[in-house]
Swiss-Prot record:
One of its GO terms (molecular function) is sequence-specific DNA binding. InterPro entries: IF2/IF5, NA-bd_OB-fold, TIF2_bsu_arc, TRAM_dom, Transl_init_fac_IF2/IF5_dom, Transl_init_fac_IF2/IF5_N, Transl_init_fac_IF2/IF5_Zn-bd, Znf_GATA. This is Translation initiation factor 2 subunit beta. It comes from Thermoplasma acidophilum (strain ATCC 25905 / DSM 1728 / JCM 9062 / NBRC 15155 / AMRC-C165). Belongs to the eIF-2-beta/eIF-5 family.
Length: 209
């Protein structure tokens, strides 16, 4: 049975790879920094902004809060009134991207922020997922799934071989025997990278009727 799950996992990875290989075409360059006195300057700031398609003022507000110093944009450059290392900048830029840009489900960078009342939603143009924006620090302790554990998921699509699929906590879970729109409790049998195989252990009462 273990071999069967291994084969199914490899098949799932191949299917997912072929269907999503062109989704995430965006490549974000590392900040190019120079120092002038006590200031750190990101020379390619606007290039980064153009790629992630976010309001530069939104990014500046985030970095100002994180670094606790004055930050201004000058043309295509960003001037930070503090000495920073490349590692410090990368850490905060990655935190911004993982919170406000990268899809929480499929990982695509092709997203936009939309308002729904007072709630800001991260909407993915690649997979269609919509989620309230939350800090990556808030989700860090609950961002993985584990073999042997049980999760309740809603099946969002069915593959050509009849297996149900869903995105959950950044993983694509393949669930043999599940139908689209069905809510099921699954036990994770195998996990590899961001792909998992789940076994149905309970269907919702509504589905049983």
């Amino acid at each position: 049975m273990t071999d069967d799950y291994e084969k199914l996992l490899e098949k799932a990875k191949n299917v997912l790879s072929s269907s999503t290989k062109n989704i995430d075409r965006l490549k974000i360059p590392d900040p190019e920094i120079i120092r002038e006195g006590k200031a750190t300057i990101i020379r390619n700031f606007q290039d980064i902004v153009d790629i992630i398609n976010r309001d530069p003022e939104h990014i500046i507000k985030f970095l100002t809060r994180e670094f606790g110093t004055n930050i201004v944009q000058n043309g295509r450059r960003l001037i930070i009134n503090r000495k920073l290392t490349l590692e410090e900048l990368l850490d905060k830029m990655n935190e911004y991207i993982n919170t406000y840009v990268r899809c929480y489900e499929c990982g695509s960078l092709d997203t936009e922020i939309q308002k729904s009342g007072r709630i800001s939603l991260l909407v993915c143009k690649a997979c269609g997922a919509q989620h309230p924006i939350h800090s990556v620090r808030e989700a860090k302790d609950d961002e993985t799934i584990e073999e042997g554990k049980e999760y309740v998921v809603e099946i969002t699509e069915v593959g050509s071989s009849g297996e149900g699929r869903t995105n959950y906590k950044g993983y694509t879970i393949f669930v043999p025997g599940a139908k689209r729109g069905e809510t099921v409790k699954v036990r994770i049998k195998k996990v590899k990278n961001d792909v998992a195989i789940g076994e149905i252990i309970e269907r919702s009462k509504q589905e049983k009727k």
